[in-house]
Amino acid sequence: MLAVHRPSSAVSDGDSVQIPMMIASFQKRFPSLSRDSTAARFHTHEVGPNQCCSAVIQEISAPISTVWSVVRRFDNPQAYKHFLKSCSVIGGDGDNVGSLRQVHVVSGLPAASSTERLDILDDERHVISFSVVGGDHRLSNYRSVTTLHPSPISGTVVVESYVVDVPPGNTKEETCDFVDVIVRCNLQSLAKIAENTAAESKKKMSL
């Protein structure tokens, strides 16, 4: 099950705003998040007057440890992000904050490459965050946060939120629509991979 939530304040004009109502909406839809302060802490963003913000939630029928083993790999995002064709770590070791990676995008998208910095990698709270700091693309000042939360029903709830500058010639709604599609596809791919891995592990244990 996947849901997209875009707070109205995130696409309005004016000074920088915070969007804590995003978390309230998440907690209403997914009660397990109301018991997890990580969601409120990491998915409250400051949004500038020429920026937009959105978030996507994905439920995955797999243990949080299985999902995290894929998500935490800053050096291998193409494992589930199928719009990426390659990734090279160009600074640091890819496993510590401050590491840099350069990713190359598949043809057909309005981008060629992106240089990204690892801002958060928290194995205890299951949080990873990165910022785009360069490259050949139109998504300037893109910042993403992904958190994983245990769910008694599905196994894992993944929340991915982002803030990004609106490119010249585009509206905030158009920008969010475009990025939401990419994030949604990534999380659906992540769900498929994690669920297949979990099923294989369960099958091996039953032998």
Curated annotation (Swiss-Prot):
Residues annotated as binding abscisate: 81, 111-116, 138-144, 160
Keywords linked to the UniProt accession: Abscisic acid signaling pathway, Cell membrane, Cytoplasm, Disulfide bond, Membrane, Nucleus, Protein phosphatase inhibitor, Receptor, Vacuole
CDD domains, per database record: PYR_PYL_RCAR_like (cd07821)
Site (Involved in ABA binding) location in chain: 179
Principal subcellular localisation of the protein: cytoplasm
UniProt similarity note: Belongs to the PYR/PYL/RCAR abscisic acid intracellular receptor family.
Subunit structure: Monomer. Homodimer. Binds ABA on one subunit only. Interacts with HAB1, ABI1 and ABI2, and possibly with other PP2Cs. Binds to CARs protein in an ABA-independent manner, both at the plasma membrane and in the nucleus. Interacts directly with CAR1 and CAR4. Interacts with TOPP1. Interacts with DDA1. Interacts with FREE1 (via N-terminus). Interacts with the E3 ubiquitin-protein ligase RSL1 at the plasma membrane.
Name this protein carries in UniProt: Abscisic acid receptor PYL4
Gene (UniProt): PYL4
